[in-house]
Amino acid sequence: MAQLTPKAIEERLSSLPAWKLQAPEIERVVEFSDFVAAMAFVNKVAEKAELAGHHPDIDIRYNRVRLALVTHDAGGLTERDFDLAASIEALL
């Protein structure tokens, strides 16, 4: 899969306002009421990621979850990253 152009990245990000470009990846931070709620969300993300065959970097700090997406094989952001980000947003 080909890397997206800067213009395409900007366009895709406009439909995902909670996601931010932190080159070379996009990231989203979500806060929950507690650790259990954060872990429940992470487990749902894991299911989506497995179905997509594309896996985010996930950092869990008590009730705070940071997700980061980049397509390592392509050396940057691709449609796969934005498709999975949209899938993750649907969980919230």
From Swiss-Prot:
Task: Please cite one Gene Ontology biological process associated with this protein.
Answer: tetrahydrobiopterin biosynthetic process
Record-given protein name: Putative pterin-4-alpha-carbinolamine dehydratase
Q: Name one GO molecular function term.
A: 4-alpha-hydroxytetrahydrobiopterin dehydratase activity
Pfam families with a match to the protein in the record: Pterin_4a
TM helices/strands, residue ranges: none
PANTHER family cross-referenced by the UniProt entry: PTERIN-4-ALPHA-CARBINOLAMINE DEHYDRATASE (PTHR12599:SF0)
- rRNA processing recorded as keyword: no
Catalyses: (4aS,6R)-4a-hydroxy-L-erythro-5,6,7,8-tetrahydrobiopterin = (6R)-L-erythro-6,7-dihydrobiopterin + H2O
Q: Which family does it belong to?
A: Belongs to the pterin-4-alpha-carbinolamine dehydratase family.
- Report keywords, A-Z: Lyase
- State the EC number(s): 4.2.1.96
